[in-house]
Regions:
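Glycine-rich, acidic/polar active-site loops that bind/position phosphate-bearing ligands
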Residues: 1-185
Length: 185
């Protein structure tokens, strides 16, 4: 992702994965907001194997996976402007002081009839549980998909406003949670 939290990525075939894991994948960092200047374009995305996950909503035949990457400079150093690297550096600083940083976010979002109008898909209010409601089923499917990807969910419920829902993720270390949040996006 970029410094603004926008997801970035590219696709490779499974045959290219061993090469990507050892050498990384070259890309032009100058085109990503907040990364580098035009004269510092070469960057390498090196996959972190611990983040490998199959995307459960894709067909099982010729499955598709996602994996997060660390961004390295041409000389093999971690790129200072990579948000993931910034978090890793700060986790190490906290660890040296004897702290472990755990995070347990509440993801709040709305369901709308379409992407053009802000008309809520339901008229529920706080903690409403309507078993046959479309949004309750959508939220349930989201929770099951997150758990299938290894992201533990503690609870979920309808929030205060019509169409507003919340999913509470179970606490974990900051880096894992940052990756989990990007997966949720």
């Amino acid at each position: 992702n970029d410094i603004l939290g926008n997801l970035k990525g590219f696709a490779i075939n499974s045959e290219e994965l061993p090469n990507a894991l050892t050498r990384g994948m070259n890309f032009d960092g100058s085109t990503i907001q907040g990364f580098t200047r035009n004269n510092e374009t070469d960057m390498y995305a090196v996959p972190d194997p611990s983040t490998f996950a199959i995307l459960p909503w894709r067909p099982k035949t010729n499955a598709v996976a996602r994996i997060f990457c660390n961004i390295l400079t041409p000389d093999g150093n971690f790129f200072e402007g990579d948000p993931r690297n910034i978090l890793i550096r700060n986790i190490k600083k906290a660890s040296k002081l004897g702290y472990t940083y755990y995070v347990a976010p509440e993801l709040e979002y709305f369901y709308f009839h379409n992407s053009l109008e802000a008309e809520p898909l339901d008229q529920g209010t706080y903690f409403d549980q309507i078993s046959n409601d479309t949004t309750t089923n959508l939220r349930r499917e989201t929770v099951l998909t997150l758990e299938e990807m290894g992201i533990p969910v503690e609870a979920s419920h309808h929030e205060v406003a019509p169409g507003q829902h919340e999913i509470n993720l179970r606490h974990t270390d900051a880096l894992t949670m940052a990756d989990n949040i990007l997966t949720c996006k």
